[in-house]
Amino acid sequence: MLARFGLSKAQIGKVGDRTSLTFWAALASLTPAAKYVEDSAILERLQKVRSPREVEMFRAAAQLISIGTQAAYHVTKPGVTDHEIYAAFSCAQLAFGGETGDGYQIGINEFGTHCGKPYGHVVRPGDLINLYISNVTWRGYTAQTARMIAVGEITERQERVLAACTAGVKQAEKLIKPGALMRDINNAAFAPMIDAGLLTSPEARTMPYNWSPMPDGTARLIPQQYVPDADYEAQGRRLMHVYPATHGPHNPNLGHSVGMAGGQNSFNISSHNYDRLEEGMIFVMHTQWLEPLSAGCNIGDCYVVTKEGFENLSRHTPLDTHRITAGV
């Protein structure tokens, strides 16, 4: 078509996001004489700062998460499986208008380090449960939260990690307002981890994290060893590796923007981000810390920046670890 209109050697502006990359690459290969000029700033701006009507959509998505989370809390007790908890969450949010039943994770083990899809784990006293709700969608707009559930008594180390992560989100939240530096918000969240002796610095470049390579830049090997898992073994399988491969957060940052279904992410809240918050920005802040075969936490809320400060879109379920009595 470009050749037909005499544009095979034209200079052409392109507007899109990362979902357009494969199309642009194909187009460039078919028209090697044409020059394509990036002009996506307007679209990137629209993804970064949301309109009041869009904020309503994100708010609804976050409320669906709260509805699902409350349903998950209601059914969780010793003897219940991860399938049943996941189903309770899914049925509740879908019944109120959620658009997908896949896009979030549940992880249960005695350490608090597991995160994935249900596989048949039976809840037991001492379990730590992570509800990592990375995507619930309303009219194409997504929200994200993370919650922890403790079943009965857990270890002192696990309590320490949960407390530091929870305090981090609450401390960072106080700084949310137009003009606030993203770096400052990130660093405020990691301060309780430093106080707890988990970290020495909030700087991403110095921070250990679960996906980090070896010091020489080579891939980090996952430790191969037998990890007892009665429910996994009841299915004829054996868990023969340790996750995470090393201690730290999943990634060395506090959070990121949320957007339309499909994984839009226009900014990260990290120590190296010197951008400032603007009214209409929507993001999740979730502190994470995992220690192999020991302790883990992933907990956070979804926020929109308002003229006066912020609105916690996921405030309908408390951030603090939900406690289940082991005998119930």
Language-model features, listed with the residues they occupy:
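Active-site neighborhoods and metal-handling regions in enzymes and metal-associated proteins
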Residues: 1-328
